[in-house]
Amino acid sequence: MSMDEGRLYKIIIRPVHSEKALNLIDKENTLTFIVDRNASKKDIKDAVELVFGVKVLKVRTLITSRGEKKAYVKLAPEHRASEIASQLGLI
């Protein structure tokens, strides 16, 4: 594992387990994570692709009122967000 890969593994802090996040899994094939606040969208995309072995179409981010960075990660149609969510114990 290269130094860069090691950094990517530290970007994803935890999955979000809210009603909205669970609805996005089914309706939009999108996973929601709390990520490192300094991570760019490209970093988040690379981290999700490396850790879960999926293709990412789009990443949207926001800073929550608690000061955490939340990332909405839309997966390519050939990958199911519900499969990743079940591996993570979300559903």
From Swiss-Prot:
Gene Ontology biological process terms in this record: translation
Pfam families from the UniProt entry: Ribosomal_L23
A single MF term (Gene Ontology): structural constituent of ribosome
Record keywords, A-Z: Ribonucleoprotein, Ribosomal protein, RNA-binding, rRNA-binding
SUPFAM superfamilies: Ribosomal proteins S24e, L23 and L15e
Keyword presence, DNA-binding: no
Record keyword Ribosomal protein present: yes
A GO CC term assigned to this protein in UniProt: ribosome
Membership in a protein family: Belongs to the universal ribosomal protein uL23 family.
Subunit details: Part of the 50S ribosomal subunit. Contacts protein L29.
Its biological purpose: Binds to 23S rRNA. One of the proteins that surrounds the polypeptide exit tunnel on the outside of the ribosome.
Protein name in UniProt: Large ribosomal subunit protein uL23
Biological source species: Staphylothermus marinus (strain ATCC 43588 / DSM 3639 / JCM 9404 / F1)
